[in-house]
Amino acid sequence: MPEQERQITAREGASRKILSKLSLPTRAWEPAMKKSFAFDNVGYEGGLDGLGPSSQVATSTVRILGMTCQSCVKSIEDRISNLKGIISMKVSLEQGSATVKYVPSVVCLQQVCHQIGDMGFEASIAEGKAASWPSRSLPAQEAVVKLRVEGMTCQSCVSSIEGKVRKLQGVVRVKVSLSNQEAVITYQPYLIQPEDLRDHVNDMGFEAAIKSKVAPLSLGPIDIERLQSTNPKRPLSSANQNFNNSETLGHQGSHVVTLQLRIDGMHCKSCVLNIEENIGQLLGVQSIQVSLENKTAQVKYDPSCTSPVALQRAIEALPPGNFKVSLPDGAEGSGTDHRSSSSHSPGSPPRNQVQGTCSTTLIAIAGMTCASCVHSIEGMISQLEGVQQISVSLAEGTATVLYNPSVISPEELRAAIEDMGFEASVVSESCSTNPLGNHSAGNSMVQTTDGTPTSVQEVAPHTGRLPANHAPDILAKSPQSTRAVAPQKCFLQIKGMTCASCVSNIERNLQKEAGVLSVLVALMAGKAEIKYDPEVIQPLEIAQFIQDLGFEAAVMEDYAGSDGNIELTITGMTCASCVHNIESKLTRTNGITYASVALATSKALVKFDPEIIGPRDIIKIIEEIGFHASLAQRNPNAHHLDHKMEIKQWKKSFLCSLVFGIPVMALMIYMLIPSNEPHQSMVLDHNIIPGLSILNLIFFILCTFVQLLGGWYFYVQAYKSLRHRSANMDVLIVLATSIAYVYSLVILVVAVAEKAERSPVTFFDTPPMLFVFIALGRWLEHLAKSKTSEALAKLMSLQATEATVVTLGEDNLIIREEQVPMELVQRGDIVKVVPGGKFPVDGKVLEGNTMADESLITGEAMPVTKKPGSTVIAGSINAHGSVLIKATHVGNDTTLAQIVKLVEEAQMSKAPIQQLADRFSGYFVPFIIIMSTLTLVVWIVIGFIDFGVVQRYFPNPNKHISQTEVIIRFAFQTSITVLCIACPCSLGLATPTAVMVGTGVAAQNGILIKGGKPLEMAHKIKTVMFDKTGTITHGVPRVMRVLLLGDVATLPLRKVLAVVGTAEASSEHPLGVAVTKYCKEELGTETLGYCTDFQAVPGCGIGCKVSNVEGILAHSERPLSAPASHLNEAGSLPAEKDAVPQTFSVLIGNREWLRRNGLTISSDVSDAMTDHEMKGQTAILVAIDGVLCGMIAIADAVKQEAALAVHTLQSMGVDVVLITGDNRKTARAIATQVGINKVFAEVLPSHKVAKVQELQNKGKKVAMVGDGVNDSPALAQADMGVAIGTGTDVAIEAADVVLIRNDLLDVVASIHLSKRTVRRIRINLVLALIYNLVGIPIAAGVFMPIGIVLQPWMGSAAMAASSVSVVLSSLQLKCYKKPDLERYEAQAHGHMKPLTASQVSVHIGMDDRWRDSPRATPWDQVSYVSQVSLSSLTSDKPSRHSAAADDDGDKWSLLLNGRDEEQYI
């Protein structure tokens, strides 16, 4: 007896160990409960005696390719050993395999292979070594359900659904198909049910419906009680209640009512199936029959569990949301004709019994954006006490509420809606005298046969949440209690968004989350503005939710938000009382944070929250209190770019100086003309008073006016510079003119005071001449500068000045149109854009179809198709067709504004070479002042030592002038000339003007360069590293070739494509998705045939039966461009003339899969497959009805321009490297196609940074070219990061250069433009340096011995000419033309040669050994041929952007040869 007890104890211990692997509650295995527990439902026989650990543990072998070292072995063992159900795992590097001991009921080998594949290796089940199930026959351990999932827009949605569902307990595996909008889930039915899976997908913001499933397990009450703790979705109370309800219905007799509904909006049998499957699952629904022809549904239901109104709502809530249900007369009230034969169940008494009159109120609601808002309002308000019924219309923006006025008032209803984050106002009320019986929130009355009123609880569509009567108590509180905490707003920084689909994904999913009231995501800024209920959710939870969607999110703690500012002009104010009236009214308005009104200027500055209120609303408030308000006129944003103010200023200064300078120049010329008649000059030399001649008096008057008028701006600028303890060119000019003026004035005053016989020689002629030439130079300089920013000004000029804001009524009919200035357009406005007009804001198309010209923004030459749901960019031109768009980003948040901001910042930034010039210019002015002083002193000394030197070069010395006066005058002349000729401006303008022109020209060519540093760095690049997936290739698999192997008369190409497309439509594999997409495009249809008996074998292929393809062939929209020899006289294929329904047995897969199914593969077919596989493509075979009939080659296709771009870079002396996480074979195949002979393969993303650093440590300047998402660390590490994508990729912070168009030749163009720009900068600097190095010595008189002498006005003219010449030199960059494709092809003609595999060196992972292409061993050939190369689709995953950019479909057929699509062997 003790021995038996020990055996029983040992078996129980083993059972608990296995159960821990299953994650089942241990208490379920207590001996006291063993008699009542249904072991057969979890896959074991009843009783513990037959259960042993060995009987439930299996051992299998998995083949693994791609391991290179013991680190790979350890990483695989560590990761797989941690999986549930894995007992042990041993990996052998030498044998390339792993031995796995596992529990089959918990984990399967396919899961193990999938996990290994996610690590970057290739894994498959070894043939003949798969574990067998235990000898005892086990009940169904796994079941499969197929869900229809609506709302997925990109690969991010797929990853999000797969990631979340895979984490659920009881889910074995999940595959989501974006193209088919389906999810296939394998699950353990004793742990989770299909309804729970559907509810989880719904909770993520998608619309899910069960498409097909296996019969659920029949669990007894004890099973439910013991297993429900493992179901995270169903609380215990809910499960018990459901069980009790079912027991009541099953054993006490149900009260069935038959109801006939009219349903509009059904189009096909799919709609019928959708309604029947989903409504049939609702609590209380016994049966439902839907007729598509009669547009009716006959429902048998239990009125104690549901009601007609609840059924109506449930059907209308089904995706796609187009169903409209009409109830029969009286179905909503108490007097319904549908009667039951028994009294109502005592188990469902009415929650509330309030007799009396019910009222109806109409509430206007603003801020609703989608059906989710409608459901949120209906769900929340219907739970309030006293609310009988609520119907919300999204199109009309209203809610009709039937309520009990003795319990709740319309004002409380309005407040409750506003607490949810919407704007609400009561429009009208009406009182009804018809008593509605025992109505309460969510209940209605239906009479039975004896007239007894029976409570019919309104059950919302099943969403996995608690029924209404299980809602928390807080939902039933009064509106006063729910308004205790006001909604709050938070801002999140989001990284990883690449396209509008990502924005839509985040907004849609967040709006479905409880507590989130409104969401607005800005792609360009990478920010999200979210209004939320702090009692329900917190910002960190929102950030975590976004991270679960596949993006990086962080809460911006110190971000104040994008509060709006508006400046208004207000007329009609008379006193301070008016000011106070306006300010107090504005500050009391919700949404306005600050208001300041100035009576003197009649201006008002208002700060507001654009989420709550807009500029038009503010103007309306001011006008309502008796004043007139309008938007204050401001200078357009582009005015500072065209330098109009500066040009006007310097033009005025030049003209003033010229008016007074011309007489001065005339007198100078007159005095310099030699004359033999001395009396002609005696008139001007005659003294008016002693010491003051007529000539000096005229000079003094003219010079004084020039100093005050022409030189005023120079003096203001010099004063500002000196006040900040700095010196610039204006200081030098003011010094020169002031010294000449003051010196002349002093000696003239002294002469007058001393009553000299002759008036002294003065410098009054110098300032007018200086100001004339310097002002002329500044004027011409700013004229030239205005041209440097012409590209940016052109971008800014794209912004529309006005927008047509419309008000929509029913059926989107336009009720009113209003022309609104751009500054007054608010977020959420509906804007009408006519043909030829500009899109004023970023938005989404609501109605209409058109083509948008985005060439000036993105550089895309061809117009882009826009349809409802498409995003539009502000500044693009509507080519044809009027459209209505909803504004999503206005003002500075638009894409155009962000691009302008980026280009502005680039033009303001300094290149490294400019920083050196700036440091030199900082010391330049003090140096010139010192040189000028030294020149003055030196010439005074020389003059007194040897007067002959000075006298020889002094122009026209007057015999009446003393020797000292001549020396002093000549010394001052040379000193002032030094001040005038020195020009730091030419040094300061050399780089900025070239950078401004260069970045502007680049922007016009679709290349956004972020500043002067990358612009200068690009010409130094010696190595360019290309990412493969999404950069060199398109990033998604495509069909490259279709090869027919059978009889074309029996199986023509159209029929093969129809059959193959239908078969692969049920596959979730990326290759299957690619084949399905190709077949649909070639056949011109979106619908395919029926697929049954589908079977997928990982690593091998699929098998199924296909039928109903005749309709596709008969009704395809466009004929396939097949060769004429395969068409009959009627133009159709021979096999299509008889539309006899057929069922085809289909096999699609690799060689091994077809051999397993008894097919023989000829050597010709095998050779054809090998040819494609050697190119890195995947070749699959197709067999129909046991006959091998075709081969399909699939690959991630190389971009057309890739090889040309690589060759051009190499011809420029740049080393090109391919770096990818893909396997070596695929990487080598891609490299041979594009001509790259250096490859880094099987590199993890974190290792890409190390590879960049490795090349940088060797002294090379490295450029990294990637998609800007997965490669962002490497982009940041590289000397120049280049992100390739659409115009929205300017949000990528890691890249230095963003190519708006997805064109690799723009990489070449950016380097080419950089070389041109840097060469122009060097020319400018050389000109500026030579000018100063030569000009200053000449001005100082160093070259007097060879007869070169300069007057001060000559120096000023030369200085002005230097600045103008530098700017004009930079403007020559505007003539730059980006080399076109024809030029590149002409240069490469005859030089581009494809590489062989032996010419490509492949570097594996972080290994330091280069691996040349060896001769393939027999084993390599066999393994390469027999396996499907899929790592290109798993190791180096395509970016979300690449997938989104490819959604529009291919522009060309994917067949290699359009004229020879069908090939035969």
From Swiss-Prot:
Entry binding sites for Cu(+) 6: C575, C578
Effect on the protein upon substituting T1288M: In WD; uncertain significance
Extracellular side: 676-697, 746-764, 943-972, 1341-1351
GO biological process: copper ion export; copper ion import; copper ion transport; establishment of localization in cell; intracellular copper ion homeostasis; intracellular zinc ion homeostasis; lactation; monoatomic ion transmembrane transport
Effect of L1043P: In WD; yeast complementation assays show that the variant does not rescue iron-uptake deficiency of yeast mutant ccc2
Effect after changing L795F: In WD; uncertain significance
Reported effect, G1012V: In WD; uncertain significance
Binding site for Mg(2+): D1267, D1271
Effect of G836E: In WD; uncertain significance
GO cellular component: Golgi apparatus; Golgi membrane; late endosome; membrane; mitochondrion; plasma membrane; trans-Golgi network membrane
Source species of the chain: Homo sapiens
Phenotype upon changing A1295D: In WD; yeast complementation assays show that the variant does not rescue iron-uptake deficiency of yeast mutant ccc2
Protein name as catalogued: Copper-transporting ATPase 2
Subunit structure: Monomer. Interacts with COMMD1/MURR1. Interacts with DCTN4, in a copper-dependent manner. Interacts with ATOX1. Interacts (via C-terminus) with ZBTB16/PLZF.
Effect seen on changing Y44N: In WD; uncertain significance
Group of enzyme by EC: translocase
The keyword Membrane is annotated on this UniProt entry: yes
Effect of D765N: In WD; decreased copper transport activity; increased ATPase activity; decreased localization to TGN and reduced capacity to redistribute to cytoplasmic vesicles under high-copper levels
UniProt-reported outcome of changing G170V: In WD; uncertain significance
Effect of mutating T933P: In WD; uncertain significance
Effect in UniProt of substituting E1064A: In WD; does not bind ATP; the mutant is stable and is properly targeted to the TGN
Name of the gene this protein is made from: ATP7B
